[in-house]
Amino acid sequence: MDAMKYNDLRDFLTLLEQQGELKRITLPVDPHLEITEIWLDRTLRAGGPALLFENPKGYSMPVLCNLFGTPKRVAMGMGQEDVSALREVGKLLAFLKEPEPPKGFRDLFDKLPQFKQVLNMPTKRLRGAPCQQKIVSGDDVDLNRIPIMTCWPEDAAPLITWGLTVTRGPHKERQNLGIYRQQLIGKNKLIMRWLSHRGGALDYQEWCAAHPGERFPVSVALGADPATILGAVTPVPDTLSEYAFAGLLRGTKTEVVKCISNDLEVPASAEIVLEGYIEQGETAPEGPYGDHTGYYNEVDSFPVFTVTHITQREDAIYHSTYTGRPPDEPAVLGVALNEVFVPILQKQFPEIVDFYLPPEGCSYRLAVVTIKKQYAGHAKRVMMGVWSFLRQFMYTKFVIVCDDDVNARDWNDVIWAITTRMDPARDTVLVENTPIDYLDFASPVSGLGSKMGLDATNKWPGETQREWGRPIKKDPDVVAHIDAIWDELAIFNNGKSA
């Protein structure tokens, strides 16, 4: 897996600009709603470039948007030339999740590139770093100087969306990197919206149990290098740190630096770092915000993050995104990361041919799986496997399983299989009282709802007592003959056939 290497976000932007994948906007544009309007239908959905707003109204700091607005740029950020190469990233993760010892000298030789990449997993700690070129603290901290965007008309307040939140639990050696949105509620205060099962929230819960009443250290990095950003959204094994995975992607060790006010380590090349703490028991109502579902979410309480220090580069760039009804930037990330999931699932379930998370299904709420079916009831086993194997699919409400003659990424094929190979009573699996996304207001209880599996495979003996239909297939000899005379027929030409 030969990777393109970027030392920092600016290296990546330079390459994007050279390839026509970055557009600089010099016209003053307001971060309040206007950037989203330029970005949404007019740029992202048209497959347009990353946007660098150099003169956001009221601010001296540029705003970077749409960085991962096409699958190609996601692949480039992971060091690959195109999306298809992301399967190799998935194979590497599958190997790291369940490494297999070499079966012999030849196998050892074949695995040497994977073992060599492991050398890039440890971080490299620096004494000084670009992200600490400027430091403000105490009363000088003012988050209002950062051009934090307001994306939708009914959003409660400006919202940080691409912050890499760094935490460490009291019993863990490695740090956790997670991306959680953060609502601005004061010059030095943000609401940290993390769900209870996410790594940062788990670290906080463990800290509260181990250190009652003590402040929980938190740091947030904005504008890290692309490998570190994407490492935070990729399904890395629980035993692998996001920094280690970023080193694998980049092909060089991730450079980190100790924070000014706590012992957490942040990406040395980040544009901006927010340092501070969460006071146990301090919460605030968060939202509403327009979300990836296409709706405003309900208001709920989350911990308050108090910022004590802001460190940054000279001439820092603020990196932002928005969420809305797909396609949005997270949906584009989902399309690309879909290719990473396939090899991970195939290692556990070799019968899986393809796996697809349609972006219109919010990128995770519906999955289509195609398999080489081997026995009666096989489809139901695969459904249960998808729901339980990776925590990324904990909130997948619908799983459709089809045979390998169906294209999982073609709705015409999938709907044909559902309507011709399913009996609703026999082939529908309903599971009640399962974990559901807090943002899913369709569930009867917040965080708890049902799941549905659809077995759209051909039925085997034991699954049906009827003679099963045989798909219509063309005669290959006739097809070859018509191919040979097709041009002579001139059916789509104005002239007459010969």
From Swiss-Prot:
Which residues are prenylated FMN-binding?
I179, Y180, R181, R193, W194, L195, R198, G199
Describe which pathway this protein belongs to, using the record's wording.
Cofactor biosynthesis; ubiquinone biosynthesis
A GO cellular component annotated for this chain's UniProt record is: plasma membrane
Essential cofactor(s): prenylated FMN; Mn(2+)
Q: Write out the residues that bind Mn(2+).
A: N176, E242
Q: Which reaction does it catalyse?
A: a 4-hydroxy-3-(all-trans-polyprenyl)benzoate + H(+) = a 2-(all-trans-polyprenyl)phenol + CO2
Q: What is its EC number?
A: 4.1.1.98
Membrane protein topology class: Peripheral membrane protein
For this UniProt record, give its keywords in alphabetical order, as a comma-separated list. Answer: Cell membrane, Decarboxylase, Flavoprotein, FMN, Lyase, Manganese, Membrane, Metal-binding, Ubiquinone biosynthesis
- GO aspect biological process, one term: ubiquinone biosynthetic process
Q: Which family does it belong to?
A: Belongs to the UbiD family.
Which NCBIfam families does the entry link to?
PRK10922.1 (NF008175), UbiD family decarboxylase (TIGR00148)
UniProt function note? Catalyzes the decarboxylation of 3-octaprenyl-4-hydroxy benzoate to 2-octaprenylphenol, an intermediate step in ubiquinone biosynthesis.
This protein is called what?
3-octaprenyl-4-hydroxybenzoate carboxy-lyase
